[in-house]
């Protein structure tokens, strides 16, 4: 489905091809149409509804934290990591979203998974880029249990790519594609 949505938004396929692809992937007609309707405003040439846009002030971290709060989340599970500083700074100004510190990325995903199962709410977590491989086993567990998780990872600035080659992944999405 991710590839179909990407192809639709990139104007590589038509609406008809998108719906046919969704049907081939065993989605019902109603589910395929619902998916199309949710991404239609992002197709080049489409008009964006006013309720899809808003003005924001602050940093990108503030925007991310505010978006998480708008989902009704109360907790953001975090692990140690250098790229998380701006988000943690933003949490100081947004006390309605409480950070829960995990000591390892794998534990972070397991804790967010357990929280989601116990509360019935989506678990949100964020970890540093080197933690992505460490977190993948528990991402697999959450995927198998169909637990709703939203996980964020920082990434190196493009001008710094390759300076810590032992920590860089060539394709971030490819590493976790089976679980998302």
Model regions: which residues?
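Exposed alpha-helical structural elements
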Residues: 3-4, 31, 175
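Extreme N-terminal leader/targeting regions
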Residues: 5, 14, 22-28
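N-terminal alpha/beta PP-like core and its mobile active-site loop of ThDP/TPP-dependent enzymes
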Residues: 20-27, 38-180
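N-terminal secretory signal peptides
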Residues: 1-13, 39-41
């Amino acid at each position: 489905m991710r590839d179909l949505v990407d192809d639709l938004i990139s104007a590589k396929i038509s609406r008809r091809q998108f719906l046919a692809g969704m049907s081939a992937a065993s989605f019902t007609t109603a589910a395929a149409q619902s998916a199309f309707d949710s991404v239609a405003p992002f197709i080049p040439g489409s008009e964006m509804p006013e309720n899809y846009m808003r003005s924001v002030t602050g940093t990108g971290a503030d925007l991310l934290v505010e978006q998480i709060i708008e989902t009704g989340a109360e907790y953001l599970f975090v692990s140690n990591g250098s790229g998380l500083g701006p988000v943690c700074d933003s949490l100081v100004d947004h006390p309605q979203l409480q950070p829960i510190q995990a000591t390892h990325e794998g534990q972070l995903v397991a804790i967010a998974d357990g929280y989601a199962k116990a509360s019935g709410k989506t678990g949100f977590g964020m970890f540093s880029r080197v933690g992505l491989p460490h977190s993948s086993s528990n991402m697999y567990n959450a995927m198998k249990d169909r637990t709703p998780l939203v996980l964020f990872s920082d990434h190196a600035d493009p001008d710094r790519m390759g300076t810590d080659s032992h920590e860089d992944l060539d394709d971030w999405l490819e590493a976790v594609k089976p679980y998302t």
